[in-house]
């Protein structure tokens, strides 16, 4: 369970993670684009940031040859964390936008509202 970031802070609607995972910067950007295209207006907050570097070695490298180069960046997402928030649009529009964004993440998510009700 997450230590913080489990409640909506900025928007009226949000997308909550239901499992633990590493989310890459490409997945976050893909979800952002999907939401931006479907919203048409309103405000979007991305509540996670890819601040952890994942390093790799080439195939020809031997063991014990150092740390390796940064391959990509990930955000560590814990169960219960709010991933994205939206405000300034009707609930139907926000729900559809979050549904499109949920496909981009490697974890199950749930659409939530500020009223504390779990929507669909």
Q: Could you tell me what each predicted segment is?
A:
Residues 1-120:
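Ribosome-associated RNA-binding proteins
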């Amino acid at each position: 369970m997450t230590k913080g970031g489990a409640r909506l802070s900025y928007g009226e609607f949000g997308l909550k993670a239901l499992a633990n995972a590493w989310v890459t910067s490409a997945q976050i950007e893909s979800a952002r684009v999907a939401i931006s295209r479907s919203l048409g207006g309103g405000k979007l907050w991305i509540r996670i940031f890819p601040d952890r570097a994942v390093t790799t070695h080439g195939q020809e490298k031997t063991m014990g040859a150092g740390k390796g180069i940064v391959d990509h960046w990930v955000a560590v997402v814990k169960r219960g964390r709010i991933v994205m928030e939206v405000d300034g649009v009707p609930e139907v529009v926000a729900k559809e936008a979050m549904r499109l964004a949920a496909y981009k993440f490697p974890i199950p998510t749930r659409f939530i509202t500020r009223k504390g009700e779990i929507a669909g």
